[in-house]
Amino acid sequence: MKMVAFVFSHAPHGISLGREGLDAIFSISSIFKKISVFFIGDGVLQLIKNQQPEHILARNYTSSFSILSLYNIKDLYCCKASLLERGLNNNNNFILNIDVLDSYNLRLKLDNYDAIINF
């Protein structure tokens, strides 16, 4: 069985990569049984609750992350160093229940996937 990892490495607003990444996950979820989602770099900003993108005339798609569990996508990982670099920590109240991993263990996890798709 092929395993696919989606990596979100860009901030949520200003570009459409986050929304496109979610759309891609939902589109291929019926094809691949093992899909995991990783948040690294500015991608960790996708996880912050109570964002108000309408103030910059952007659509708030981040609430769509909450339906990942309906697609049986439960392996969600975040880079601890990326959180700390942005003044966040694993005690923050994020929109998802995520496993926070150090950079080394995050790389070890990613090494197990057949395909890695970056958004």
From Swiss-Prot:
One Pfam family, short name: DsrE
Source superkingdom: Bacteria
Keyword annotations from UniProtKB, A to Z: Cytoplasm, tRNA processing
NCBIfam families for the chain: PRK00211.1, sulf_tusC_dsrF
Transmembrane listed as a keyword: no
Location(s) in or outside the cell: Cytoplasm
UniProt protein name: Protein TusC
GO CC entries: cytoplasm
Function (record text): Part of a sulfur-relay system required for 2-thiolation of 5-methylaminomethyl-2-thiouridine (mnm(5)s(2)U) at tRNA wobble positions.
Family label: Belongs to the DsrF/TusC family.
Chief site of localization: cytoplasm
Keyword ATP-binding: no
InterPro entries hit by this protein: DsrEFH-like (IPR027396), Sulphur_relay_DsrE/F-like (IPR003787), Sulphur_relay_TusC (IPR037450), Sulphur_relay_TusC/DsrF (IPR017462)
GO biological process assignments: tRNA processing
Subunit note: Heterohexamer, formed by a dimer of trimers. The hexameric TusBCD complex contains 2 copies each of TusB, TusC and TusD. The TusBCD complex interacts with TusE.
